[in-house]
Amino acid sequence: FITQPSLTKMVRELEKEMDIQIFERTNKGVHLSKDGEIFLGYARQVLEQADLLESRYKKKAGGKQEFTVSTQHYSFAVNAFVDLIKEYGGDTYDFSLQETQTYTIIDDVAHMRSEIGILYYNDFNKAVLHKIFKANDLEFRELFVAKPHVFLNSDHPLAGRKSVTMDELAPYPYLSYIQGDHNAFYFSEEIFSTVVRSKNIRVTDRATLFNLLIGLNGYTVCSGVIDQKLNGASIIAVPLRKEGDMHIGLLTHKQTHLSRLGQAYVAALERYIKGLQG
């Protein structure tokens, strides 16, 4: 147990020692400063590394490894996460894989709640996203470039085509992921989000999207990367005849270095990407 005055004194001494202001204090209360957010991100990494050392060399009972990824809805991100846990999970761990909205991914990495983010940019949103990356001291590292595809139900009337056009898709419901309060086209997870469509359905998760694809003969525009082991054979990817590239990659904070688990996860991602390209 520690008293409030003692805690306040310790924080002020830490601020003095580190020569930074961790908290901003006003008559409305106390909140983290920008330097404070970065400091806590570093501190979190140090504590996690210390736990790993104790767990490895002192056989500390109950010591948990922690690791968090925020990502758009990509099956290869899940595949790599599975591999990471199988190889490094051990008996105790606390890992998080968050399939979430684009802005949340950026915010999670910027505030070091997630070590790694996974998202894409294209010619349309590149300038806006990279400006946000720079403002938040984030670094984007490209994993691969994907050509546009659509996900369809395997029984869809267009499923047998070698490729499809936007005009051919027009009669069918278009599905996309909700982007919450930041629903600008620049944050859309789907390329060609500015195209006007007569039938639109927005969802929050991949399972619902796939169920609606099957139930309504809908479609969504995507990278074309799908794993039948995870998603079954009822969803297929068909090339879309429309010019555009999706640059899919990793988002990390420039003020941190990847942990051992982060490095292992990136290696697992790269193995899957190599398999896609090979």
Predicted segments with their positions:
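A short LG(V/I)-centered, amphipathic sequence patch enriched
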Residues: E13-L32
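Alpha-helical linker/hinge and terminal dimerization helices associated
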Residues: E17-M18, F39-A61, F67-T68, Y265
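Flexible hinge/capping segments at coil-to-helix
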Residues: A61, I132-Y174
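Central regulatory/effector-binding core of bacterial HTH transcription factors
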Residues: K64-V128
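Secondary-structure junction motif
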Residues: A77-D83, N122, K126, M166, ...
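Hydrophobic hinge/microswitch elements
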Residues: D108-E115, Y120, Q179-I236
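Beta-alpha-beta core module
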Residues: A135-R141, A146, A207-H257
